[in-house]
Amino acid sequence: MAFVSQFNQLPCKTLALNPPQPQLTSKPSVFPIASIGATARAAAGKSLISVRPAFKVRAVLNDDEWGEDKDEKYGDDSSVAVAEKEEEKPLEPSEIYKLKKALVDSFYGTDRGLRVSRDTRAEIVELITQLESKNPTPAPTEALTLLNGKWILAYTTFAGLFPLLSRNLPLVKVEEISQTIDSENLTVQNSVQFSGPLATTSITTNAKFEVRSPLRVHIKFEEGVIGTPQLTDSIVIPDNVDFLGQKIDFTPFNGIISSLQDTASNVAKTISSQPPIKFSISNTRVESWLLTTYLDEDLRISRGDGGSVFVLLKEGSSFLSL
């Protein structure tokens, strides 16, 4: 390099240092006398070494051969290497997150699986299979803290729920189907919430579960509970209702409906003060099992008797707002 050739032409003087000769005294030496001469010769040899300036490499980002003349120095004027920190890139969503989002997006318009086309069903099955193959919790029953809490049903292939979802009772709507797991007391509570123009109510079943394997739990239902209707904040009667394919117009009966609203409101307040109705479930046919094939902090995929699939989202999950 051009700089090296110019550097070699610089004049360098050799410094010759003559160390003072040690004075010998009559005291006995710790070392043999022969070692004194060897030490003196070694010291003289070291004094003949040429002194050259020291250079250190500095890390730079320029294309220039030696970089910019901006060395950072300490108090002794010695240069130091400087490492430039690269700009951090934002983290991209993981593959599992993308699969979960695609799965939740595919539920749109399916009414929890009641109304789903053949193509959409095939897409959902494929996404579920991919998530199950990437399950971050291989032994869900050993991770009870993740299982613990309220899970809201987003999709199912369980035919037993379809009559409930498709009954289309006038003025009654299924608001939420959920499952609450208490891992400390080993209990499961399944709940269906209904809403109407006057009040809301729920039907709940309580069960005990027993861990049978890292993936499987055995469930035994013990009692059912019909919740006391709770009066809604506002009572609204629609102008018309579709019932059994016919549209019923309530407009001519607005006066009568208004008086009925007051009466119904008083009745609802009286009923709301009553305790819920409980009934025992002792039939052995209500025992079941549940296999959890995917589990994380947001989403759970379980399979029940007959291969039915349940996809549930944890209460508070951001996927519930998609």
Swiss-Prot record:
Query: Which tissues carry this protein?
Result: Expressed in corollas. Not detected in fruits, stems, leaves, and roots.
Q: Where is this region: Disordered?
A: 67-88
Origin: domain of life: Eukaryota
The answer to keyword Plastid applying to this record is yes
Q: What is its main location?
A: plastid
Asked if Oxidoreductase is a keyword of the record, the answer is: no
Cellular component aspect of the GO annotation: chromoplast
Write out the annotated subcellular location: Plastid, Chromoplast
Query: Keywords, A to Z?
Result: Chromoplast, Plastid, Transit peptide
Induction trigger: Up-regulated by gibberellins within 20 minutes after treatment and down-regulated by abscisic acid and ethylene.
Transit peptide residues according to the UniProt entry: 1-58
- Entry function: May be involved in carotenoid sequestration within chromoplasts.
Similarity comment text for this entry: Belongs to the PAP/fibrillin family.
Q: What is this protein called?
A: Chromoplast-specific carotenoid-associated protein, chromoplastic
Protein species of origin = Cucumis sativus (Cucumber)
At the highest ranks, the source species' classification is: Eukaryota, Viridiplantae, Streptophyta, Embryophyta, Tracheophyta
Q: Which gene encodes it?
A: CHRC
